[in-house]
């Protein structure tokens, strides 16, 4: 049986993992519990939040488990491109990869990550006056400056469709 293993910082990835668990009946575990409970080589669906195109938890979990599919949870549908995620994380070409928009709540971030976002907010405030800003940049700017929660069941539709093709018992 496949298990959903998630790495969450501000709660968005955990919300997606719980939603998918309810919809599919797959067990959901955070990374700390998974490494203690699951036998080495277990089949997992990894849900990891994205920071700088790095899928959190991937490097650690790929050495321990058989990752069947990855859900990369980013700020918006524009914040992480699949090609860039594959390259940055050295993902195999045949690894199923889904990018889920989550949003951001700066108040739930901690330490280094909060500092990075604050620096990005300052940079964005300066760039907002430029006329050559794209729609994608404008959306990311809005999310960073004002926060957003984009977690939704509908974003899991393609993941569910992919899962329905396989028997992971």
Segments the model singles out, each with a brief description of its role:
Residues 1-64, 161-169:
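N-terminal beta1-alpha1-beta2 submodule of the flavodoxin-like/Rossmannoid cofactor-binding fold
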Residues 50-169:
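FMN-binding flavodoxin-like domain, especially the glycine-rich phosphate-binding loop
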